[in-house]
């Protein structure tokens, strides 16, 4: 995810904290470069809309939250987040440009990094008929 953020002007990344085991809790903001430059104004417009009856969304981008893999033993979501993030960072053409001009995506690649690591460890040590206890083989 850091590489995507470094390579694309559509993505910013921030560490929102860390898990019990010390893994980072990342949040990517994915949108057009134009929206990134106005992100504080967009945030304020959305906050103001919660305090009024203004339901007009035609003049501001919508905000979407995408979170992947809350259950550690279901790794496909976090694995898919890499591909989804890459598509949003690198795709070209009018369709992706229109999407990112009209949407701010708050992108959480793994709700549960500790559980994902626990499952990966389990899968790598228990997936074979012959258990391998040698720690450097994991």
Question: Residue spans of the language-model regions?
Answer:
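Sec-exported extracytoplasmic/periplasmic mature domains
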Residues: 2, 6-9, 85-93
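Surface-exposed loop and adjacent secondary-structure segments within mature catalytic domains
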Residues: 17, 28-32, 42-46, 51-54, ...
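Divalent metal-coordination and catalytic microenvironments
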Residues: 22, 69, 107
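Short, contiguous, well-ordered secondary-structure segments
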Residues: 24, 40-41
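Short, solvent-exposed loop/turn elements at domain surfaces
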Residues: 35-39, 74-75, 116-117
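Second-shell loop/turn segments in exported
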Residues: 67-74
């Amino acid at each position: 995810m850091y590489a995507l953020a470094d390579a694309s002007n559509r993505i910013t990344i921030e560490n929102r904290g860390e898990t019990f085991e010390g893994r980072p809790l990342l949040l990517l903001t994915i949108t057009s470069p134009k929206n990134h430059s106005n992100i504080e104004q967009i945030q304020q417009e959305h906050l103001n809309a919660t305090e009024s009856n203004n339901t007009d969304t035609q003049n501001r981008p919508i905000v979407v939250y995408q979170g992947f893999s809350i259950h550690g033993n279901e790794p496909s979501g976090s694995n898919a987040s890499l591909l989804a993030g890459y598509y949003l960072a690198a795709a070209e053409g009018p369709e992706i440009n229109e999407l990112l001009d009209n949407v701010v995506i708050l992108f959480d690649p793994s709700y549960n990094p500790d559980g994902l690591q626990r499952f990966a460890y389990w899968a790598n040590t228990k997936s074979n008929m012959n258990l391998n206890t040698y720690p450097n083989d994991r």
